[in-house]
């Protein structure tokens, strides 16, 4: 195996590749603002273990999405990633019509700008959801739970 092949194989095994839950963790930190948080509390609020949150922050730091302290998001890098990279790294997966939590243009603030028919709703499948619509797989399984507990994160 050549040098490039070894580098690619090494990168594939690296523990530093972003995972979907890493984006959830960074977004939760962003909406926390100046509020102090602990790994345990953050994990409980978004449905992850303390260990998962810790590993997510290490990967986010390695990717440049949080600062060296792993306490503050790098807003510029995060915005660039969300706008230009997320759809390629974690493409949306559509599913059947179901009951769930509104997402995309079906949720504020986009629902105020994008006019759509009541039957043209996108939802994350969620048993406690109150909207019926086309299902969209959430970035991570605990996203609907986390969004239902934190309206700011849901936006």
Where are the language model's segments positioned?
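Long, low-complexity, charge-rich intrinsically disordered regions
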Residues: 1-6, 96-155
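Short alpha-helical segments that sit at the start of domains
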Residues: 2-32
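Short, cationic-aromatic polyanion-contact patches
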Residues: 15-22, 38, 68-100
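Generic structural signal for hydrophobic core residues of well-folded globular domains
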Residues: 28-33, 60, 146
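Short acidic, hydrophobic short linear motifs in intrinsically disordered regions
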Residues: 34-46
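Non-transmembrane "mature" sequence context
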Residues: 40, 57, 66, 135-140
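A short, conserved structural fragment
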Residues: 48, 59-72
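Helix-turn-helix DNA-binding helix
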Residues: 53-54
